Amino acid sequence: MSKISTKLKALTAVLSVTTLVAGCSTLPQNTDPQVLRSFSGSQSTQEIAGPTPNQDPDLLIRGFFSAGAYPTQQYEAAKAYLTEGTRSTWNPAASTRILDRIDLNTLPGSTNAERTIAIRGTQVGTLLSGGVYQPENAEFEAEITMRREDGEWRIDALPDGILLERNDLRNHYTPHDVYFFDPSGQVLVGDRRWLFNESQSMSTVLMALLVNGPSPAISPGVVNQLSTDASFVGFNDGEYQFTGLGNLDDDARLRFAAQAVWTLAHADVAGPYTLVADGAPLLSEFPTLTTDDLAEYNPEAYTNTVSTLFALQDGSLSRVSSGNVSPLQGIWSGGDIDSAAISSSANVVAAVRHENNEAVLTVGSMEGVTSDALRSETITRPTFEYASSGLWAVVDGETPVRVARSATTGELVQTEAEIVLPRDVTGPISEFQLSRTGVRAAMIIEGKVYVGVVTRPGPGERRVTNITEVAPSLGEAALSINWRPDGILLVGTSIPETPLWRVEQDGSAISSMPSGNLSAPVVAVASSATTVYVTDSHAMLQLPTADNDIWREVPGLLGTRAAPVVAY
């Protein structure tokens, strides 16, 4: 280990949290630690073609929409399609709407000198300040009036703001993660931002966004340790220069260094990185840093964590390895389990069992030493927090409950978590799963998929807020969900042609997964870093995630309809 890594490990010791407790109870202890500015892209070097001579009105409008993907010089490329008077009044910064596609229709009453064209499409998202994608699902309609100016068609009246087809967003913008710590200070959480591809200084854009703080959607679930006086000065003489960081102690400086280094590294900005705060090195003993120096905070480290496959079959749990199926001991082979989650690193099993017409959440070791944590009419499949520091389940379709072990008594403690649903969302929660960082929560309500943010209003308290529908195109077909280690959400559905889908965590994209030999419905889904597992109408199947489109039965479980459980 390098001298720098050794020193950094010493600095990070106060941030570490032990996740296992002694004794027969295996659930970890309950421990609670406790302005976005407007965004504009940097200049581009690419020359953008403007209107062509004698261009037809519909083609000119298409060219205008394509030019709207270039934010440089206050959208000068798009303004070239406007009449002289409209250029000074149109406000492109009012909004950026993302449409699945843009349809054009000329309205009656058009003449050789003036035309009005209707614009229609489904708005699938909005690109907010700072490159934040907000999913939407609404029909969009507007009108554009065109007039001849010096013999050429130009746009004379139009709504403020930019309209982009989704393909133009993907072609000209790339999502990057800006990293912030969860409230425990243990794990970096990505805050996804869509940034213009042709920026000359992507690194400076990212550092400015980092100092500006987390986006409103995720802000309640992460920590922003910088004061409002903090600012990013720029990249000068090979240094990333910041001011207003004088209030940060050594631990806070280390955390900010981790945020900056991993934000840059995951955007393919090469290191080493020199971070300067108020004229001096951010970390006094380490003027330059690499990702190796801050490997403890690698936000993708858990994507390569070794996982273990288990199967839930006929109400009993078994370990599956190299074609061998080994039943677990005791209560875990009792034949009454409906769903389960397992943490192999913490040796914790959480299972929902049926007993005397009740659902019972039982928690214990794999060896079978257990405690009953909850009883209710219904309990959803349990889900673990980051590092297995607690687990969650939803009782009776409406109340999330967090279960953790008391640090003082050693007993299981149940805490109801408030959930703030959008006003128009009603119905029971049938699935509820935490992301690997524990900061995001995905849920299914009446067959629709939603993602929210887990916040900590006070010691021991939890709240799920900022809940947004992320896959409206699936309608009400969702049946099962699972977070991949890389933050992609997998959704099993009842759609016959495409029963399995992947959804980006910000809702910016949804795509079907290979379905050649899958048979809907997909009632269970789980994933490791390398393999996706599902239960369809016939069997438990697996699909390697690397360039493969053939689902195969799991060795040892041929011809059986088991549910996959992947443990970390």
From Swiss-Prot:
InterPro entries referenced in this protein's UniProt entry, alphabetically: GerMN (IPR019606), Lipoprotein_LpqB (IPR023959), Lipoprotein_LpqB_C (IPR018910)
Highest taxon listed in the record's lineage: Bacteria
This protein's GO CC annotations: plasma membrane
Keywords for this protein: Cell membrane, Lipoprotein, Membrane, Palmitate, Signal
Localization per Swiss-Prot or TrEMBL: Cell membrane
Residues with lipid group (S-diacylglycerol cysteine): 24
Protein's name according to its UniProt entry: Lipoprotein LpqB
